[in-house]
């Protein structure tokens, strides 16, 4: 779902150059002139056909004036009135494009005069203009990525580099196929960025070590994890770590072949906490799961946005509402 959004323009017009072209021999013709110090504004994420403002020019001969515009952005100008509006293919976002250049041309029937302008974009609070449903998505994004079910984090955690998983323990052909199926489902959700998860053949080339076996086997392999799971009823566990703001290493223990358990522990490794959508909706991130637990549609969107190329590792709780809101509006 792609929404066309338009940022607030403070259309600040600076005369970088002013050229005239006269193809006739009418030396008595007066060139048209742009009105000085014009400025315009429009809200970020405004709708298609929203008006930025009207470029004004005058002609001492009272000739009829015709306007045209050239810009890398999809901007439209009314040739008779000079009103600039947003084109259908315009996606204007303050966070990625704080200003836009354009050239306005005015023609009086004899002479063309050009004016280079800079359109500056003003930021808005994206969360404030979301629908109620969109705000619910943001709130649930916060719940999962800030681990609000337990000790809430102050910023999100996510992987910077692709995951490379080494499979260890009692890995049967059938279970390896299950792992690949789960990875395929996850990878389909990373379509807004460059992140991916793959299986590798050696531990040396991996950054994720997945072990399939019983809890007792973890005591020798990962003593620190065994201290956590000993005496508990856990069927799996994941511990991730990183450098700076990005995750880059994970250890995952799995004791059951059900697909939902692997999805669950991989979700934790990717930076997601437990869900509160468990009584009826059966999220794959519920603390207690069965084969019936799976990705909810809203969770698929959350994974897409978490691993969007513009979602920065370490985005703080204070920044999160507008960061996610911006991605919702742009996608």
Label each region the model flagged.
Residues 1-4:
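Positively charged n-region of N-terminal signal peptides that target proteins for export
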Residues 129-131, 232-257, 273-331:
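Metalloprotease/metallohydrolase-associated module, dominated by Zn2+-dependent proteases
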Residues 173-278:
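Metzincin-family zinc-dependent endopeptidase catalytic domain
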């Amino acid at each position: 779902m792609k929404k066309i959004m338009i940022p607030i323009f403070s259309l600040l017009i600076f005369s970088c150059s002013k050229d005239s072209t006269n193809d006739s021999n009418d030396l008595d013709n007066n060139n048209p002139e742009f009105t000085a110090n014009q400025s315009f504004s429009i809200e970020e994420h405004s709708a298609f056909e929203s008006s930025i403002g009207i470029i004004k020019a005058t002609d001492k001969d009272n000739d009829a004036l015709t306007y045209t515009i050239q810009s890398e952005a999809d901007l439209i100008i009314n040739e008779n009135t000079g009103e600039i509006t947003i084109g259908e293919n315009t996606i204007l976002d303050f966070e990625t494009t704080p200003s836009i250049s354009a050239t306005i041309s005015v023609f009086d029937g004899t002479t063309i005069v050009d004016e280079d302008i800079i359109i500056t974009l003003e930021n808005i609070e994206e969360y404030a203009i979301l629908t109620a449903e969109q705000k619910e998505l943001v709130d649930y994004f916060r719940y999962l990525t800030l681990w609000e079910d337990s000790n809430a984090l102050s910023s999100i955690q996510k992987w910077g580099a692709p995951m490379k998983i080494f499979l260890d323990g009692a890995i049967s052909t059938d279970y390896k196929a299950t792992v690949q199926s789960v990875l395929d489902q996850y990878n389909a959700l990373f379509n807004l960025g460059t992140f991916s998860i793959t299986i590798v053949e050696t531990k040396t080339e991996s950054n994720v070590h997945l072990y399939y076996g019983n809890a007792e086997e973890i005591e020798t392999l990962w003593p620190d994890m065994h201290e956590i799971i000993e005496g508990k009823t856990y069927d799996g566990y994941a511990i991730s770590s990183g450098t700076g703001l990005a995750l880059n290493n994970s250890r995952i223990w799995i004791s059951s072949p059900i697909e939902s358990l692997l999805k669950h522990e991989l979700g934790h490794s990717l930076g997601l906490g437990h869900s509160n959508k468990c009584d009826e909706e059966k999220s794959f991130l519920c603390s207690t799961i069965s084969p019936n637990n799976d990705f909810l549609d809203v969770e698929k969107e959350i994974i897409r946005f978490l691993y969007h190329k513009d979602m920065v590792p370490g985005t703080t709780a204070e920044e999160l509402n507008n960061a996610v809101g911006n991605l919702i509006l742009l996608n």
